[in-house]
Regions:
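A structural signal for short, well-ordered beta-strand segments
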Residues: 55-57, 101-105, 119, 133, ...
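Catalytic strand-loop segment that frames the active site of acyl-thioester-processing enzymes
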Residues: 25-70
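Hydrophobic beta-strand-centered segment that forms part of the acyl-chain substrate-binding groove
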Residues: 8, 81-116, 150
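HotDog/MaoC-like acyl-thioester-processing domains
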Residues: 1-21, 109-111, 122-180
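Hydrophobic core residues within well-ordered beta-strands of beta-rich domains
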Residues: 53, 97-99, 115, 129, ...
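Short solvent-exposed loop/turn micro-motifs enriched in small/polar/acidic residues
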Residues: 37-39, 96, 126-128
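Short beta-strand micro-motifs enriched in acidic
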Residues: 46-48, 106, 120-124
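Short amphipathic alpha-helical face segments that pack within enzyme cores
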Residues: 74-78
Length: 180
């Protein structure tokens, strides 16, 4: 199987319990976060004490590209939504937008499957954040990897000002540990 640097990093992480530092609030206007009944993806994410972001989600038939397999754009969205959370780890007021995504699909992402999306700690260079991560299938194998470049918006930017107005809600179920 062909691999790349991000795949190798993600494959080297031991599958074990990781202590949750805190859950990540979500917004009703967020496509990735809001409940499926409201058209969202219902991703729930957590910061761990070992500096990962770990999220859970369950794939569904309505987001298939081929029968039984999630659409590639949906796979990209799972990764973008979760990796982006590393930009807010130290300061929730930071607002960042995606500049570039390098994405590799390793295995089909089947429907009706609980997945884990994991983001490594960000590499930061001024306003630029570089985050790597993966989607794990229930058997621990990697379905997709990404390296995403984000840029932080300036505080007086119109988009950033609107983002600060969004109502954030707590995660419904607090976890002490999460496995990936």
């Amino acid at each position: 199987m062909k691999t790349n640097e991000t795949y190798d990093k993600m494959a080297a992480i031991p599958h074990e319990m990781h202590k949750v530092d805190r859950s990540i609030p979500w917004s009703t206007t967020c496509y990735g976060c809001r409940p499926k009944e409201q058209g969202g993806m219902f991703i729930r994410a957590y910061y761990t004490t070992d500096d990962y972001v770990v999220a859970t989600a369950t794939t569904e038939e309505v987001k298939n590209g081929f029968p039984g397999v999630q659409h590639g754009g949906v796979v990209a969205t799972y990764l973008d939504e979760v990796l982006w959370r590393q930009t807010k780890r130290e300061d929730a007021r930071v607002d960042a937008m995606t500049v570039e995504t390098q994405l590799n699909y390793w295995k089909p992402l089947p429907e009706n499957t609980e997945i884990r999306i994991v983001a490594l700690p960000a590499e930061v260079d001024g306003r630029h954040y570089y985050v790597e991560g993966a989607i794990y299938l229930p058997d621990g194998s990697i379905a997709a990897t990404a390296k995403i470049h984000y840029i932080c918006l300036k505080l007086n930017d119109e988009i950033s000002m609107e983002e600060q107005k969004r109502e954030m809600r707590p995660v419904e179920t607090e976890l002490e540990e999460i496995y990936f």
